[in-house]
Amino acid sequence: MLDVADNSGVKSAMCIRVKRGTSSQGNFTRSMASVGDIIWVAIKKSLPTCQLDDKKVHKCVVIRTKTPIRRPDGSYVRFDSNAAVMIDGDGNPIGTRIFGAVARELREKNYMKIISLAGEVV
């Protein structure tokens, strides 16, 4: 279970699959997601005004993890909760606001729209 940190109307979601690159047979998956990975989720809790369908699978980008992230300078950063942002087919966020801090590693993975909507980049 992870929190959804935008105003799309979804409050919590459960990860179903982690997308990690491609192979000759198609997409291959991994069991753990890190910051900047695209995951497929099932919506578990949402507001009544949410326009996303609870019965379908949706895409998210992980923006915070409890697992420490090692940076090239040797420092580690970790967050208090696992959080993601709902995205559409083009990789743009569905919501117009992002709550809480996001990791700087999203900038390296070209999620500039998420970086610009976030209040703080750690």
Residue ranges and their predicted role:
Residues 1-122:
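Ribosome-associated RNA-binding proteins
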